[in-house]
């Protein structure tokens, strides 16, 4: 892609997200979401092939439908209340339709079907932006709507997302699809805690983005996209394999890694509000995610193919893009748990 065009696209993407996050008026927030959607399409089609074209088309159709639903909800609310303020959506029908539209943009269940297909059809860097940056704008609107949304709808979507995110990833062999289902599952945790403590939703989002960025950067550096290529990682880059293994365990929420921090705090918050069955159900369903993370670790580090000296030397001739961000991201991905008491004091 032309560097000038790429810089313009990324600047517009950044501007669209910031406009939505800083807006308290529905119309400007909607404009920011549309800027986000339109600039994401050329990013998805960075490499022109039938799969990326199909993925971009699916993304556009889904996001355009969600945008129409959101505009319909805003129109209904304007007719009944005469307000454009995000904090004053008093009509229950408008509130529910807007909630479903934002859930569709986030890719939470039962509006999740586009996420694995779109992620699988694009490059690793495009998939990384789709599963991290594109969550910020819709979730910032849900954060502002947390006081008056239909909590039953949020709980239902959250539990379904955790279940489908774990169940859907069990039989996958493509790493991008596995990370897409992981995104759906983490979105379920964020939605469920939103009515209780929106600050914990932001904490979970920050750590999820940190972990997902780390994994995508490792996969992009090692040119790994499937389980079959994952089995060659130990022969090529043992250090990267160890980093991938610990980051996957952290993404699964295994103590004493960073990914355990938000789950620990969210379960504590739910039990503090006399909700016992829900966190227990969430923790049990998350074991499905842990299973396919462990399967990835098994393929990458415990299954070593027979190799020759020539194969062991291939990493020296592989053109990989080294980044200074990766060591910092890996360190944060695995060592934030000791900061949990300080984080809990800031709530």
From Swiss-Prot:
GO cellular component: mitochondrial inner membrane
Bilayer topology annotation: Multi-pass membrane protein
Any one GO biological process: mitochondrial electron transport, NADH to ubiquinone
Source species, domain of life: Eukaryota
Organism: Mammuthus primigenius (Siberian woolly mammoth)
EC number(s) on file: 7.1.1.2
Coiled-coil residues: none
Localization annotation: Mitochondrion inner membrane
GO molecular function: NADH dehydrogenase (ubiquinone) activity
Disulfide linkage: none
InterPro entries, A to Z: Complex_I_Subunit_2 (IPR050175), NADH_DH_su2_C (IPR010933), NADH_UbQ_OxRdtase_chain2 (IPR003917), ND/Mrp_TM (IPR001750)
TM region(s), chain numbering: 3-23, 25-45, 59-79, 93-115, 150-170, 178-198, 200-220, 240-260, 274-294, 326-346
Similarity comment: Belongs to the complex I subunit 2 family.
Chain's role: Core subunit of the mitochondrial membrane respiratory chain NADH dehydrogenase (Complex I) which catalyzes electron transfer from NADH through the respiratory chain, using ubiquinone as an electron acceptor. Essential for the catalytic activity and assembly of complex I.
Upper lineage: Eukaryota, Metazoa, Chordata, Craniata, Vertebrata
Protein name per its UniProtKB record: NADH-ubiquinone oxidoreductase chain 2
Keywords from the UniProt entry: Electron transport, Extinct organism protein, Membrane, Mitochondrion, Mitochondrion inner membrane, NAD, Respiratory chain, Translocase, Transmembrane, Transmembrane helix, Transport, Ubiquinone
Subunit structure: Core subunit of respiratory chain NADH dehydrogenase (Complex I) which is composed of 45 different subunits. Interacts with TMEM242.
Group of enzyme by EC: translocase
Catalytic activity: a ubiquinone + NADH + 5 H(+)(in) = a ubiquinol + NAD(+) + 4 H(+)(out)
Keyword Lipid metabolism: no
């Amino acid at each position: 892609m032309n560097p000038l065009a790429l810089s313009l696209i990324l600047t517009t993407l950044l501007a669209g997200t910031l406009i939505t996050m800083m807006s308290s008026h529905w119309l400007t927030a909607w404009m920011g979401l549309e800027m986000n959607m339109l600039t994401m399409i050329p990013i998805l089609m960075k490499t022109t092939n039938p799969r990326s074209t199909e993925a971009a088309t699916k993304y556009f159709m889904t996001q355009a439908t969600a945008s129409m639903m959101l505009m319909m909800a805003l129109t209904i609310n304007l007719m009944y209340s005469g307000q454009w303020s995000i904090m004053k959506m008093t009509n229950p029908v408008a509130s529910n339709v807007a909630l479903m539209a934002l859930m569709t943009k986030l890719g939470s269940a039962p509006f999740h079907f586009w996420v694995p297909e779109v992620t699988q059809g694009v490059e690793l860097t495009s998939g990384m932006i789709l599963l991290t940056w594109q969550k910020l704008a819709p979730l910032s609107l849900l954060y502002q709507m947390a006081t008056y949304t239909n909590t039953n709808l949020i709980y239902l979507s959250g539990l379904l997302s955790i279940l489908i995110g774990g169940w859907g990833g069990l039989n996958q062999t493509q790493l991008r699809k596995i990370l897409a289902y992981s995104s759906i599952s983490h979105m379920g945790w964020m939605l469920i805690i939103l009515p209780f403590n929106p600050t914990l939703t932001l904490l979970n989002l920050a750590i999820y983005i940190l972990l997902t960025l780390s994994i995508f950067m490792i996969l992009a550096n090692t040119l790994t996209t499937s389980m079959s290529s994952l089995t060659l990682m130990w022969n090529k880059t043992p250090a990267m394999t160890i980093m991938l293994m610990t980051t996957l365990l952290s993404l699964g929420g295994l103590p004493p890694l960073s990914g355990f921090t938000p789950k620990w705090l969210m379960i504590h918050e739910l039990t503090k509000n006399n909700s016992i069955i829900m966190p227990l159900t969430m923790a049990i369903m998350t074991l499905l995610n842990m299973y396919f993370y462990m399967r990835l670790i098994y393929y990458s580090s415990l299954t070593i193919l027979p190799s020759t000296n020539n194969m062991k030397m291939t990493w020296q001739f592989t053109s990989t893009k080294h980044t200074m961000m990766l060591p910092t991201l890996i360190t944060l991905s695995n060592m934030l748990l000791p900061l949990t008491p300080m984080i809990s004091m800031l709530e």
